[in-house]
Amino acid sequence: MTSVGTTLIVKPANNSGGSDGNIKNNNNNNNNNNNNNNNNNNSNSGNNSNNNSFIDDQVLHTGYLTKQGGRIQNWKIRWFVLKRGTLSYYLSPINWEYTKPRGVIYLTKKTELKEVDHRNRRHCFAVNPNYISENQSIIQQQQNQPILRSSSDSVNNNNNNNNNNNNNNNNNNNNNNNNNNNNNNNNNNNNNNNNNNNNNNNNNNSKLYPNSTRIYLISAQTVFDKSKWIEMIKLAISSDNSQDSKLKRANHQLEKVKDLVFSNRKGSIPTFPSLLNRTIATESLNDLIKVHLSKKRFYFYHDNLTLPALSYIDSESPVNLQEIHHQHLILLQQQKEELNKKLKKIQQQNNIGGGGSGSNIANSANKINNKNNDKINGVGSGEDKNNNKGGGGDNNSQSSSSSVSPTTVSPSVSPLSSSPTKPPIILSKKPLPTPPRNISTSDNGSGTDSPFYNSAITRLPLISTSVGMVGPNGMVNITSMNTTTTTTTTTTTTAPTTTNTNTNIKPLPGIQQNKLQLIQNKDGGGGGGGVLKRTNPLLSTSAPSMAYNQLVANSGIIHKHQPKIVVFHLVRDSFQISNIGGCSFNFEILSPFDPNFTLNFIPSSGTIQKGDSLTVLVELMAYNHIETDIYSTLHIIGGMEFTLFCRIETDPYLPLFLKSCAGSVLPLEKQMKMESFMKKNPTMVKSIQELAHTLILDGRNIIPLHLSNNININNNNNNGGGGSGYNIGGGSNNSIGGSGSNNNSNVNISNGWNIENSNRRNSGGCLNLVGGSGGGGLINNNINNNNNNNNNNNNNNNNNNNNNNNNNNNNNNNNNNNNNNNNNNNNNNNNNGSGLLSSSPLITISNQNTPTPQARVKLSKYILNFQRNQKKNSVGDVESVKIYQLLTDKFLISNSGSADASFQFHFPSRGKKNDLFSLSLVPTNGTVSKGEWFYIKSTLTVFVETEISEMIQLIINQREVHHILITVKCENIHPGNKEIDLEKEVVLHERLGTGATGDIYRGLISQDNLNRHISNQDSSGSNSSGSGSGHNWLIARNPSNDIINKDAIIGSGPQIIVAVKKLHPLADPSPEMIQDFYNEVRVLSMFNHPNVVKYVGGCTKIANWSIVMEYVPGGNLMDVLANPVLVIPYKLVLRMALDIAKGLHYLHSLGILHLDMKSPNLLVSSLSTSAKVNIKVADFNTCINRSRITAGFFNRHTGSGDNNKVEKDSKKGTTLWMAPEVIRGAMYSEKCDVYSFAIIMWEMVTRKLPYSHIAFNCEVEDQVLKGLRPPIPMHCNKNYTDLMEQCWDDDPENRPYFDTIIHSISKMIESNDITEQKAKASFKGLRRTQSNSTLNLLQVQNNNNNSNNNNNNNNNNNNNNSNSNLNNCNNSSPNLGTNSANNDSGVSVLQTCSDIGVGSTGTNSGTSGTNSGFDSPVIVTKDYHLISNLQKLDLHSNDGSDTNGSQIGFKSDINSKKSSLEVHSKHKSKRFSYDGGSSRASINTLNNDSNLPFKFSPPSTPQSSFLQLKKLDKELKSNLESNAGTKHSFIRYKPSFTNVTSAKSKLNLNNNNNN
């Protein structure tokens, strides 16, 4: 006979048929359960492990690892298998169970495990078994314990213990596989076996370990894999595998269960039937009962999950059901003690009740039993609907329970569903198949579709007969027996349990009922107690139906991993109970109580006929994040018990989102946890927030009533003193109502969930307690303890719908209230005898008749990464975001609800991180009307190189919160960009210039600080100074004799002068200014070219924007050209033009357009013709990338009349240098810079500003569009003029590219060098043969330029004027007058003449009109130094000179062997209009873009091909060879500058890199 309260839990056997894990408590001596595994472990007797295969052969962990060899120190990959006590490795995982391992590492208590670092191997750990030390311990134990006695402990409670002990010993020794009834034989076998195998059974170590000192070095693949292996190996080492410890541990756990069952029964919490509170009556065991369960482990799958990413985890459930989880038992014990304390605290209150009976809302036929039968007259008496009179204490408890027929299931409602009730049904006798799982089914349109996905919700379908019945309409109705345990408790006695079958339950609208109802009487209670009803307010008007509505016959696919439970989502599984015995039996399923979840078995009790099967549905819903194991008990009345196991591991993040999205302020730790989840899982942010908001709007985010931790007592005076009562396990605002005479003690038990929201909603957590009749009435306890209807706002109707079941007609089951009961205080005067406890949710629940309008706001995305408009690189990846880049993004906000919604953005980090980024959202607040949608535009600018991951909140109607994640990783403007702390690293001094956006300062930076910002390429010396020394520009700029205090500079080493462009400080810069600064820094950091100004670094801090550049001492080109003291020879002009062309060609090769090319943006590095670099291009704030240029980039025309004016913002550059297409507003191209280069060429020739006679820029633009160009000087070289005219052609297609321009200028420089070489060679010959101090210049024929010599017919007339006093050549310069018969005559550029003899008068060709003589005299000094062999050409202008002629003067310095030429031009040319057309041939190239910035392709046009130019070079070379034999050769000078005045001025070393 089984004793009362004993729970038998036996490990299931591995047999496929028969009773799977059945424990038979019969009177016979059947010991099959002990002998099922005898033959399974014979092969493991020598492996130092226990013979229990179900435990010892359990594989803890497997995987590939790399192991170092023992003899040969090589590394090999092996398949490792970890079991308790052993770590084996195989060649491969294929059939490793049937193959011999390559090696075994025995894990003992002394095995050491640690992480090591081994050479190049990563993720290594070492295993040191310590076999020698373990063997010594074994030998010592064998000496201390010579004989091992088998354990006499047994889990089985059979009548023949001798057989059990014998069989257990046989199992240990593997000697007897037969179940013999002869005890003596078994005992003899046991003794012999124990004596023979004494050493083999000592501490599960049958043999000594090998005498080896080897340390196994193992390497894992990843650091996570290594941590997992170390953890599992430690677990295998720490586990005790001995049989004694197993039996001891099992008995210890059994005692724990017994203690939980029998101890403190009086104070146990009333709840569902479970191991903690059930009372098992004396039963007679029936040996004909045989039960088979389809499964005893449950893996729940979601019924209506809309977030598949949360559904599965890699988690394994415990295998051994016999070993109940120790921590779980401790947790249950702690919960039990905690709840007992709460009950004792409540019981200490004196609740002196008046008369009146209390009954529950279920309208059961129960009369409340006054255990003491004390007739205490109450304040009043009354009766309920069932005529249960209160008062007088004559109320006797009677329970009427319906008889249960065989194979009959009493119908009820699932606590987690709202299915209608049905009459009792008779199950079919045919066994049912296992229900399929994890099959996607479509919805029937009952409001269960996901509001965010068009696809149907994945459900777990069940076959209809598996849940008992199919209704007439084909709908599946899940039924269960509602087992109600009613305990009437006094201070001294405990009444036995009674089972009531409620068949007339009609749940309240929107409230899902629970099964347990408790009626409790307090001392002094007059006739009746209050009513305790535990409800589960999973209120949802659009929640999916919990009953399955589709028949599925196919078998489902079972997921390999443990499914994860999502809070507030129903999960289900099922199993079958089959009666394979000879009689019918009754069963009941007992589930544990836990405040964090609800586990229901449907049906939870019933009768199964012989040969029939019943499918039991298991429903689970979790309310918080938990990770635990649940052990339930299936009790077969008169038979046996089974342990049912399920693993719960919930998602830890959805509860956080439910609280935060509902408006609750999370603790800092949980807030960081939620934000960390959003940052690590950006793809799930949208889904999980939509799921949370759906649960909130549906009212499913309310914590159930039984989640109670804190107790708050509030006393309210109400009319009447009904029966005392309280509610256990309340939710957010639940009252435990006790009643005294005219004094109701209301105790609020809650865990503090969402108190803030409850207060904001006033009566959102309203509880109404109805006391007994007589003095009892309606106790309406709001959160504010206020019965004023004015504070209930919109929730009054909902509370009345849920709680107004007490009408004046005393009808308990009246769900449809005709009276709205707007005044809750009037309900307190009703003498209802029924006790009612109900709850309303925090979120407004719509009335079924007149639903309350709700707003449903949705966002198109919850993550803003600002990469919508980012370009993609060649690989296809999106380019990284740069600092100071204006980033834009947008998202859609819509309202699909029935009411308007107000919204407002909240920036938690605003004010804290303003120096990092600037974020704006437009609009920031407003209203979204129902059915309306629009875009929210967001702009972001990041100021520093960082990774931003910030949260902003969108608040809807001041109660819903949407969290939007902003994640941007900003890199520096360019890899070459260096951030400089301007205040610490640079010392600013005098201002060099000013501009529209900022000022230019001269500063000093130390060499050490500069080296940290300059790359090796910048310091390679390719950019030499103007002195021609070839050293680094940093060294050349070292101010060794500077008067600046060097101690003021932070850093050591020599100090370097730099130029600092500091922008005007602005507190709130506009986006345009930010982009201009960003653009200039970005472009400068990309460049590395000798003709582009060097970029040192930049300071990108707000209000301290600055750019540190190379200091160029010569100033800008415009100031140099305007300085009259500076002498600029023609050779220098060509070299400066070549430098400018190279710099612009480099920009164009990178796809950069300057668009503001002008002389103020060109810095002069040197004026020496021997310098490698003369000009550097600067000022790049208007640069744009060619790839960003589109037709829509510009505003074409405003359409205002005939002028076709263009918007000012669409034009970049300065008017004087602006190309016609830019003025028209056409699309930019490289030809815009080519036009500006032509204007600069004209500036260098004339040393004037263009269009100086026009006052207004608008007039300049009109004239340029009409074809006006600056006048070309008459003395300018033809090739130079042709190139200049080509570059400023009105049609951009006719303008050459810069590679062609570079080639043309290079040829001009080569031609000029050849001319100089000829001049030097000619005058050396004159110096050897001529002894006179003067030389009469003769007319010679010019072979190179015959078209421009018509103006030089009268040059020989001036020979007599060449007599000058050479003795005063150091102080004065002779004037050589040249009379020109033509006003257009001028002095041409240096050109080579043909060879003639000395004294030759030349030849004049009258027919051709060409003067073949030399134009101007050449003076030779006594020491035969040619005056024209000059190194410096000084050009001055004489405005008062005569216009009919020109004077040429020479200054000669004999001592320094240097001479200069002064040209005084009296000719003033008139301006003329130029229509852009030219009859001269232009030079173009077929290749528009040059890939190499320093290798230029020659022109290949038919007009002037490379072969023609090469032919010209051959002719020049032949002329030089023919002139080598002559005695004299002459050159003629054509000065190339006019109108230059002589003045004295100092050298202005200003660096004006501004506009």
Curated annotation (Swiss-Prot):
InterPro entries xref list: Kinase-like_dom_sf, PH-like_dom_sf, PH_domain, Prot_kinase_dom, Ser-Thr/Tyr_kinase_cat_dom, Ser/Thr_kinase_AS, Ser/Thr_Kinases-Pseudokinases
In this chain, composition skew of type Polar residues spans 437-452, 833-850
One Pfam family per UniProt: PH
What GO molecular function annotations does the UniProt record carry, in alphabetical order? ATP binding; protein kinase activity; protein serine kinase activity; protein serine/threonine kinase activity
Please give the residue ranges the record annotates as the region Disordered. 1-54, 138-208, 342-452, 486-508, 781-850, 1012-1031, 1340-1383, 1457-1480
Task: List residues binding ATP.
Answer: 992-1000, 1061
Q: Compositional bias (Low complexity) at which positions?
A: 14-53, 138-205, 359-378, 395-431, 486-504, 781-832, 1340-1376
Q: Which residues form the Protein kinase domain?
A: 986-1309
Q: What is its EC number?
A: 2.7.11.1
Active-site feature positions: 1156
Q: Which CDD domains match?
A: STKc_MAP3K-like (cd13999)
Q: Where is the PH domain?
A: 58-238
Looking at the UniProt record for this protein, which Gene Ontology cellular component terms does it annotate, in alphabetical order?
cytoplasm
Q: Does the keyword Endoplasmic reticulum apply?
A: no
Any one GO biological process:
signal transduction
Provide this UniProt record's keywords sorted from A to Z. Answer: ATP-binding, Kinase, Nucleotide-binding, Serine/threonine-protein kinase, Transferase
Q: Which reactions appear under catalytic activity for this entry?
A: L-seryl-[protein] + ATP = O-phospho-L-seryl-[protein] + ADP + H(+); L-threonyl-[protein] + ATP = O-phospho-L-threonyl-[protein] + ADP + H(+)
Is Kinase one of the keywords UniProt gives this record? yes
**Family per record:** Belongs to the protein kinase superfamily. TKL Ser/Thr protein kinase family.
PANTHER family hit by this protein:
MITOGEN-ACTIVATED PROTEIN KINASE KINASE KINASE 20, SERINE/THREONINE-PROTEIN KINASE TNNI3K-RELATED
Protein's name according to its UniProt entry: Probable serine/threonine-protein kinase DDB_G0276181
Native species: Dictyostelium discoideum (Social amoeba)
